[in-house]
């Protein structure tokens, strides 16, 4: 009996999978391909599917991590002998574990060093030690932006967040980015404060941000979708332009049977399926990509050269290489194509 029940459950599962597979609008790639096909079909034209160019991947970690300058050994030895809390901070750094600090722990160390050295400076009376402390604090403050960069864009977890191996951003989903967006906003405020040399900030949440980056891959999915949608909208726009150049859809602005079919597809597929996905991408860009772009831009002074080209492609909102600027241009051009097509028949929305 259990075998029969298992067989029925398996059959039901297969039916569900088959039905899902028959719905081209359940995922971004088949949805956009189907859309281009239907545009061609209703306009009696054969669409040409352009190749989606390979995305520029995030530079390898070794090309993102900046070398962290160290204090002179003599200065560290001197400070480690002085009887205030700073000797313990220096001692931890000189330990075996301290020599292989991960970027976030290194940032915590740098902040703690500056704070502790400042506290020591208020209590010390020896002029020589005062001079050493002031020099150490100045050096650490100067190199703090490097530690901040390494703890944001120099971590392995960033590669998972931006991986392209997880396909496109899902269709018809809600609230996928709330945690990532909240993290990005909080991280930006903290980094901005640190760059202003305000060290009275909480770094305790930072590790959780990295954990979420390691578990999520939404930024990479969004970039995949932006590239896919821009290319496929361009394909559909070319079909429209070809029809407009070859022969009118309507004569004397009067609708006909074909224009009714075109209008029906416009509302059912473009307005009903594609536009909601475009709205999802715009929201996701605002919620996640824009704060991440800000996180990189505010650290432009230390941004590695290898990272800059990738930033211009994946995170920048403007520029020839920006996937987001290209998406905006594709949407604008496609909208104008629909307007020109429907206007021939007096069917332009809002007219």
Set out the residue ranges of the language-model regions.
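Detector for Asparagine
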Residues: 23, 63, 94, 105, ...
